[in-house]
Design a protein with these regions (language model features):
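C-terminal outer-membrane/trafficking sorting elements
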Residues: 1, 7, 529-572
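Bacterial N-terminal signal peptides that target proteins for export
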Residues: 6-9, 13-26
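Sec-dependent N-terminal signal peptides
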Residues: 25-33
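Sec/Tat signal peptide C-region and signal peptidase I cleavage site
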Residues: 36-40
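Active-site mouth of glycoside hydrolases
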Residues: 43-44, 50-261
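Extended, alpha-helix-rich binding/interface surfaces that flank or overlap catalytic cores
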Residues: 56, 347-408
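Extracellular glycoside hydrolase catalytic/binding regions
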Residues: 79, 83, 172-175, 179-182, ...
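Extracellular ligand-binding interfaces
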Residues: 411-485, 490-513
Length: 572
């Protein structure tokens, strides 16, 4: 009924509008005013958003990956830490598994010029990945990630001196991000910064390192800086207008630390000294605070006590004291020199179940860091820690049916490969592997190749071996080195074609790890998925921009009727 009235009100035939009697016009205006009020109130509070997120996951080591030296990079940075190019199918899998939110960490400085402008191609790629998340109906937290950290090239540090030096660059960055997404709805949140450290790169709290005495003056300066960054972030985002005037924003504590005692009260200062930014434009209720935690799980009694203390502390020192909801933006286990999931598997499952249930009890959203699906598993996509993913979801939602946790056992892919150039290459493995862990590689083709048609090529040694059968094995030798960065299937001539059925890395104990092929250079690859999550043809179904009734984009809409994503709404 309201849409019908909107159409009549938007009709541009002046003669028709003159004939409308005053009483009818008044009725329409009253309906529109009511609709406007409903629209203005529909942008949920941060507390509502955090509760509605359920359980989340981090798309880690992907858009946040960088060359660790501060130099400029192109779009290939997304895969430089060994993760594959992100596909929309991955987000579809996470949604179907029961996850309600994805944190998208992004490192920006390798993609900014000297005038602080973000490369257009990089912004477009970030935009695409954000859309993958939102198009699956999940919440998305977009942040500034390894621009913070403990390396010299990390330019955001928690000192007022650094803040004063980089304030212009920091605000320019957030102004561009905010402008890019200003028309997006309430399921997109911005996170101001990741784990920001002082000039001494101290984790947990300023002046933490034991080789230096605690310096209260230096610590206060760090907390003052954190609060200044947080306020700049809120002010810049709000000033861009559009939906950013009400968007829920996230600020982190110093180092995203979650407090604790440790024999002194200093860790808790990360919570108590955080000042929630003034948010005049949005009013109260649109800011959340984020912390990270990675407990040890060697002793489950101690672990559960630590978890209990954590959530009690977050409630008393943040939610109750400052009136803000809390997001656990990263959580996992300490992995004391090894992978807990492998060596303390039962403890990890028990911990995840307990942690998520406790977080739900305290109305905290949780975002598991990495794991669950990692490396080439993301491309298929499948879970390599399916039982952990299922534990996390069931801890929050209960034994609700309908969620899916595909593994490599559930998926079969074949790759049709056409070599367009002589000596062109297909990636069988990309990303560093150690010959102390793996002893070889197994390749299975649909049929045996012609003699001398193909060969294995190993990098960086560039050692080669002919592929002579439908199933061929490459045994790693000392001549190939202790570390292998890439293995390809090279064609001796242009025009060769083949179908790859399976590629496995063979571990020292004989177990196999399936991998995914991709084009290296001079060849084209078509993937045929026999089972599993079906491919998604990505088209941006919504552009989230706001238009007037004449179809013109409006960047700063005032009062009136507008169109967004094909629907009319009234902005009061």
């Amino acid at each position: 009924m309201i849409m019908k009235i909107f159409r009549k009100f938007a009709h541009r035939n002046l003669n028709y509008r003159r004939k409308m009697n005053k009483k009818r016009l008044l009725t329409i205006c009253m309906f529109i005013a009511t609709a406007g009020t409903l629209h203005a109130q529909s942008f949920e509070t941060a507390t509502q958003a955090v509760k509605n997120m359920g359980v989340g996951w981090n798309l880690g080591n992907t858009l946040d990956a960088n060359n660790n030296n501060g130099n400029r990079q192109d779009l290939t940075s997304e895969t430089c830490w060994g993760q594959p190019y992100t596909k929309p199918e991955l987000m579809k899998m996470m949604k179907e598994a029961g996850f309600g939110a994805i944190r998208v960490p992004v490192t920006w400085f390798p993609h900014m010029d000297t005038s602080n402008k973000v490369d257009a191609a990089w912004m477009k790629r970030v935009h695409e990945v954000v859309d993958y998340v939102l198009d699956n109906g999940m919440y998305c937290i977009l942040n500034v990630h390894h621009d913070t950290g403990d390396g010299n090239f990390h330019w955001l540090h928690a000192s007022t001196k650094t803040y004063n030096n980089v304030k212009g660059k920091y605000e320019a960055l957030w102004q561009q991000i905010a402008e890019e997404f200003k028309d997006y709805g309430e399921k997109l949140l911005f996170e101001a910064y990741n784990e920001m450290l002082d000039d001494d790169n101290c984790w947990n709290y300023p002046s933490w390192y034991s080789n230096k005495a605690y310096n209260a003056t230096s610590a206060k300066d760090s907390y003052d800086a954190i609060n200044k960054y947080a306020q700049s972030f809120v002010d810049v985002v709000r000033a861009t207008g559009g939906n950013n005037t009400k968007r829920n924003l996230v600020v982190n504590t110093y180092a995203a630390a979650c407090g604790g005692e440790w024999g002194n009260g200093h860790p808790n200062e990360t919570l108590t000294e955080l000042v929630i930014p003034t948010d005049t434009k949005a009013g109260s209720g649109h800011i959340a605070v984020e912390v990270h935690t990675y407990p040890g799980v060697t002793n489950m009694t101690n672990t559960k006590n630590e978890v209990n203390a954590l959530f009690s502390r977050l409630k008393s020192k943040l939610t109750d004291a400052k009136g803000v909801p809390v997001i656990i933006g990263e959580w996992g286990t300490a992995n004391n020199g090894e992978t807990d999931y492998d060596v303390r598997h039962d403890n990890v499952i028990e911990f995840a179940d307990y942690f998520v249930k406790k977080a739900k009890e305290y109305n905290c959203a949780t975002f598991h860091w990495m794991g669950l699906t990692d490396g080439t598993n993301r491309s298929l996509p499948v879970f390599n820690q399916a039982d952990l993913a299922e534990t996390i979801v069931k801890a929050y939602h209960g034994n609700t049916g309908g969620f899916k946790y595909p593994t490599r056992d559930d998926i079969t892919s074949e790759y049709e490969v056409t070599y367009n150039n002589q000596w062109s290459e297909l990636n069988l493995i990309q990303g560093t592997i150690s010959t102390s862990t793996y002893k070889g590689l197994e390749l299975e083709l649909a049929e045996a190749p012609a003699a001398k048609a193909f060969q294995f090529k190993v990098y960086p040694s560039e050692k080669t071996q002919d592929i002579t059968a439908a199933k061929s094995t490459l045994t790693f030798t000392s001549a190939m080195g202790t570390s292998i960065s890439r293995i390809t299937m090279q064609s001796s001539q242009a025009g060769n074609k083949t179908t790859v059925k399976n590629v496995y890395l063979i571990k020292k104990d004989g177990t196999k790890q399936k991998t995914e092929v991709s084009a290296f250079w001079g060849c084209s690859v078509t993937e045929n998925i026999i089972t599993g999550i079906m491919p998604v043809t990505y088209t941006r179904s919504t552009d989230h921009h706001i238009y007037n009734l004449s179809g013109q984009r409006v960047t700063n809409p005032g009062k009136g009727i507008y169109i967004q994503n094909g629907k009319k709404f009234y902005r009061k």
